[in-house]
Amino acid sequence: MMGKLPLGVVSPYVKMSSGGCSDPLKFYATSYCTAYGREEFKPRMGSHVGTGYKSNYRPLVSYQPHLDTLDNPAVGEQIHDTSKSVASQSYAPLEVPDGKQPLPWNLHQTTSGYGREKVNIGPLSKEVRKVHFDTQDHGPQTITGLEPKEVPLIHQQQGKGSTEWENSRYGPRFMTSEYNSKYLKESPNHPDLLLKKTIGSKEETGFTEESTKNPIVFQPPSQAYPGDPVLHPGRSITKSDYLPISHPQGNEFLPVLARGSDRDTGYSRVSERSLNPRMPTPSSQPTSMSHRSYQPPQRMQQSNVALLGRESVGNKEPTGFTLNNPSYVRSSYEQDRDQRYLTTYNQGYFENIPKGLDREGWTRGGIQPQKAGAYALSEPVTHMDTTPNPTETLRHLHPHVGRTLTSVDPFYRDVPHSNRYPTSS
């Protein structure tokens, strides 16, 4: 029979709680929902209130242009567009002409809206002529007081190209640069009918005009080898070797093979008979391409001297490419394996691991003694701790823990071979 469970002090949180939620559809019952929630609660629609930025706005009084029409029309004209933003003024909507606009008085084309507010970098010529005069249009005899300046000889500038000496000592021309006024020659407007200009043949430049007289580079056609192109200094080897593409005209001869020529290609030709009885029969194994390319010339037909036995073949000697290389010795354990791709690296840095019967001494007799590696040599000597004593261990443990260990394992306290556990005879 169970007794009454002790109850603690009721907290204010428990007093305010309405108990657990009995609705099986409410799967997620939070603490706030169980404490303050009400059944069939529906939120009321409230009014939307502006944010902090909106509440800080001052009341805006809209301006109407008709307010200053009678009282102050000048001020109304100045502030008629103050309520408009810069973006709305600059990026106005597209206006397409409908044909009701009056014709323009100016016949010249006006600039677009993008260039309307462009800042003028330099003054216009019309504005400059209102203030300054052009000494080229109005000479010194036309306007009084514009006579050439008389400078004493001592104060005259003797340097070349002085700008004060131009245009009767009035400087360069009107609105032109110094180079344009001094060194630019004006082309005549009238056509050149009297001067007959003729264009001659194209000649070589100074770099290649006299290059044929060079005795070192130049090779006359008479001294060129037969079959070799004549090397002129003015013409590169690329141009002489790679000629432009010439399309067939239709009058070329058809390709015809000569009589008695072999019509089989080098890819389909099979040598079934032995060409030279002294040479061994080629093996079925694939050989290197370099061995095929650098084979000695094979005699297709013996001459009369060879048939009489008066021809002798000497010993084969290495060429200059293989004379200085170390001699290759074929290994005894790979007699059947042909070293077709023998490189200089394999000759100099050969593999010195014994193979075959030479390797049996390493594995004969079972497991060999292990040698200390680099990791074992660098490690210090580890001292083993003494054997733990169960009696000393129980003295330092809690009594409850010690009794639990001895009850579970009776051999934990003393050594099994002690006198406490006599053996049955």
Curated annotation (Swiss-Prot):
Location(s), subcellular: Cell projection, Cilium; Cytoplasm; Cytoplasm, Cytoskeleton, Flagellum axoneme
Keyword Lipid metabolism found: no
Bilayer-crossing regions: none
GO cellular component terms, A-Z: axonemal A tubule inner sheath; ciliary basal body; cilium; cytoplasm; sperm flagellum
Keyword Cytoplasm in record: yes
Signal peptide limits: none
Main subcellular location of this protein, as a coarse class: other
Biased composition range(s): Polar residues: 321-332
UniProt GO molecular function: phosphatase binding
Pfam families linked to this entry: PPP1R32 (PF15691)
Ranges of biased composition (kind: Basic and acidic residues): 260-272
Gene Ontology BP annotations: flagellated sperm motility
Composition skew (Low complexity), residue ranges: 277-290
Location of region: Disordered: 259-297, 315-335
Tissues in which the UniProt entry reports expression: Expressed in brain, ovaries and testis. Expressed in the tracheal epithelium and in secondary spermatocytes and spermatids present in the seminiferous tubule. Expressed in ependymal cells lining the ventricular walls of the brain.
Keywords from the UniProt entry: Cell projection, Cilium, Cytoplasm, Cytoskeleton, Flagellum
Subunit relationships: Microtubule inner protein component of sperm flagellar doublet microtubules. Interacts with PPP1CA.
Protein name: Stabilizer of axonemal microtubules 4
